[in-house]
Amino acid sequence: MNKKKLLSIAIALLLGASSTFAQKQPVDYVNPLMGTDSKISLSNGNTYPAIALPWGMNFWMPQTGKMGDGWAYTYASDKIRGFKQTHQPSPWINDYGQFSIMPMTKQLKIDQDSRASWFSHKAEKATPYYYSVYLSEYDMTTEIAPTERCAYFRFTFPETSDAYVVVDAFDRGSYVKVIPEENKIVGYTTRNSGGVPQNFKNYFVIEFDKPFTFNKVWADYHLVETHLELQSNHVGAAIGFSTKKGEQVHAKVASSFISPEQAELNLKEIGNKTFEQTKEAGRKAWNNVLGRIKVEDSDENRMRTFYSCLYRSVLFPRMFYEVNGKGETVHYSPYNGEIRSGYMFTDTGFWDTFRCLFPFVNLIYPSMGEKMQEGLLNTYLESGFFPEWASPGHRGCMVGNNSASVVADAFMKNVTKADAEKMYEGLLKGANSVHPKVSTTGRRGYEYYNKLGYVPYDVKINENAARTLEYAYDDWCIYRMGEKLGRPAEELDVYKKRSQNYRNLFDPETKLMRGKNSDGTFQTPFNPFKWGDAFTEGNSWHYTWSVFHDVQGLVDLMGGKKMFVSMLDSVLNLPPVFDDSYYGGVIHEIREMEIANMGNYAHGNQPIQHMIYLYNYAGEPWKAQYWLRETMNRLYLPTPDGYCGDEDNGQTSAWYVFTALGFYPVCPGSNEYVMGAPYFKKATITLENGKKLEISAPKNNDDNRYIRSLNYNGKNYTKNYLNHFDLLKGGRLVFDMDNKPNKGRGINESDFPYSFSRDAK
């Protein structure tokens, strides 16, 4: 063979390898185990591997924790107790409607401890659309491929006459029935952690493709010999097979919050598909969603981090609706227990996700955002209030009235197609009342706030300063929406004035926000490093920046841009000192700030996540460009310890996605995104309207992190923000990056992002 021919073959092989590498798709970069190495005292994400489709009604997960444990999967665990259908948004909120399936061989073991099998991450494969693990105790493999409301299981058994599958419907009221002639198990679970009506049930159906050689039901881990149907506090089923070596047994699983019949209907999502076809359909669904944003980088870890964060950004809020036999969208109402028409979504806390998760959906996936807004309207119609934390119904968690932000942002961006007047009515209701049973829904302390302009420190309402600051922003959101709707001026003026209530807590002596008593005096003594008390999971240094809608007003209160920048610098330069006396010990959020090595900047919790972007409002955008990259480099990794605190239903992930693209919605409702700097050399967003937005930064790297200049659609662009409706037109942003800050760019007030005070002048 001559040298020329050898060279041709070598080139062909190289091209083939290059082509194979190029065929790697977005979902291939996702690590569902990112953030799973967590515990109650330290959160590296507090996530679990959600085996699901985007926004799916049901997720599946390997269960390592005990029944009812919020930390249901932890990376440090070495035993699996079952494979659980889960709807858990957070370990702190816990789960509802859960049940589990556990295969085994040799001896039938029902108890959750005795049935657990050793496993290794080396024999575990986790992707969003497919999960596989070898259970060493039983010499068998379990595989799962999900749909939105179903899952396809494939069990590969050894040769044995003692192959079993145990179904656990969990405690606190459950039902199960084995139907041997149909190779089927049906049942329901009522297990929940609150936020459900009295008639709440999750009905399930499991169909196997192999006849049973053994079938029993059980109660409280004891087999029942006399019948195959049982309802009690804690029941389940056990079925068995004889299998050859390598034989695969399949199970199709569906569930419904509506009825057993609807659970059977939901099985149609799998229909006649094989396991492999279901798996491939899931892969395609994920690539369709993740592929809306294409980033390019030679560092695979950055690609993995980006797409793992994007995956987390499209899980919640989850669908809580189904499709009936007539093809109509219907839902079980977690608010009144009725079956209603239309969409419903749940499992999100607006205190976290109003900040950038919902704006992200509104920009990249507006048709899904439209459905979510209809779901919010249905929540108001069915319960009298918008949710603040829903799982599946109203939950007593966190502070604020941030449904106003979620509703207003979608409306201002023309995402909402639901009855906007009715939604505005709901905002007014929530701003001037409190839910009779769930005081975190609506506004706790609204009477004081409306009268005094703040929630006082001395009236036994906890976290009062945090409430005041968030209520003021929420009032601005109501004002914005009302203005666009053409509401009466006298009505708008109420919320316009209230939006300035943040000023009532500003202490000119310390230049920080501070709790205030009902007589108008500031709380004393005052320690700005004290967590909790007047604030929520943070201190005054963190919450002072919660003036999303009027940063210029805050700049003015502090004495001008120079002092404002100095105060921002202080957060990042101060040591991570803290006062934990309010909690009586170090909470995990404090520990996560302490170990991050970024001063008093607590990125692991939401109140401060927008802070670095505020340099853009004071003429020093290069500091934002520096610190945003530091945050991404230091605090995010595509590993089990990859987050710097609770991931929180997409918020902390969507922060990374936005920031990596180079912009962030500091003030939802303003239709603006504040500039950072792109993280990748190239990113392409395919918008839902078919337009493409290309973000190019050819010289971008860790040294060249500063924007020297920006060319936007062929023109020099100096502003520190981008407009939502301009982005929807598509186009090209070309960044010239440098290793030195350009201190002459973005320094004029005309370049600064929206602030109410400046806009009102």
PLM regions: where:
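Accessory carbohydrate-recognition regions in carbohydrate-active enzymes
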Residues: 23-358, 362-405, 411-469, 477, ...
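ATP-dependent phospho-/nucleotidyl transfer catalytic cores
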Residues: 474
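Bacterial Sec-dependent N-terminal signal peptides
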Residues: 1-23
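Extracellular attachment/recognition segments
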Residues: 706
